[in-house]
Amino acid sequence: TSMAGISGAFLLLPFQMSVLNYTSPSVSGTNHVFNIFAIPSGVYRYIKEGRMAWPLTWVIIAGTLPGVFLGFHVRVLYLTDPKAFKFFVGCVLLYIGSRLLKELIRKGKIKPSAAKALEEKFKQQQSSRLTAGIPSHAVVKTKHISLKKIEYEFWGEIFSFNPIVMFVLSFVVGIIGGAYGIGGGAIIAPFCISMLHLPAYTIAGATLMGTFITSIAGALFYSIPLIVNNTSSMPDWPLGILFGIGGFAGMYIGARLQKFVPQRLIKIILGLIIIFLSIRYILQFFV
């Protein structure tokens, strides 16, 4: 999942709820703990390889941080019922999966020239050598920053986004991610790829970094001594750290291998997994 800029916490949460029967509000805080210990290795790889879009990173962080605080209160005060929370989780996952698969199933849709050119370069690079992927000289370079538009260059192509739109989206996502325990990157990443047509090779590091910072805030919020309906919101730190150790290795490997994997394959794998989980959790609400 780190190949697409997602920490994997959105898949870890259903595992904890279904297999471990861990359904109290503190499960969201435990997910934040996982992010804190798992993400740094992936972020390190993206920074080292020059594929960290810093302007995008700071906009995401600025928007999601205040949203996470509100999301914490939503989870603890209004989503304490496991059945209702699973339905909420299913709706979030359905959105993520549909965004990833949308442009894969649409026919006749012309991609932006920059995104299309990038895919063509990747195909040519693959055909030239068996181990070819994104070349080492392909790094993110910021070209222009303003309140209306931020532009950056990657592999000879120019990509841009509106920072105000991204900030508002990040704030809303922060609320959802704060309640869900994912930090928000799992929702922002497919939006950046599908709606803004930014390549996964450049947004993955930014969304992971944003998730890391907001997860620190989320874990602190959930660690506040607060008991609602006889249920504590305190994260299970040992469990979160244990998950994080495994995630640390997975994040590093995923970030390292990303430049060798086509974007289409990344979207298909993630999309199918997420859609399956979302349908499962939505249906359980009506049974």
Regions found by a protein language model. Name each.
Residues 1-5, 171-181, 214:
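Transmembrane alpha-helix interface/packing and boundary motifs in multi-pass membrane proteins
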Residues 12-26, 187-202:
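Interfacial segments of multi-pass membrane proteins
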Residues 18, 24, 45-173, 194, ...:
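Juxtamembrane transmembrane-helix boundary motif
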Residues 28-36, 61, 65, 204-215, ...:
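Transmembrane helix-bundle signature of multi-pass membrane transporters/permeases
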Residues 2-10, 27, 184, 203-205:
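Hydrophobic alpha-helical segments that either span membranes
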Residues 189-190, 207-214, 218, 255:
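Feature representing long, continuous alpha-helical segments
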Residues 10-11, 59-62, 186:
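Hydrophobic alpha-helical transmembrane segments of integral membrane proteins
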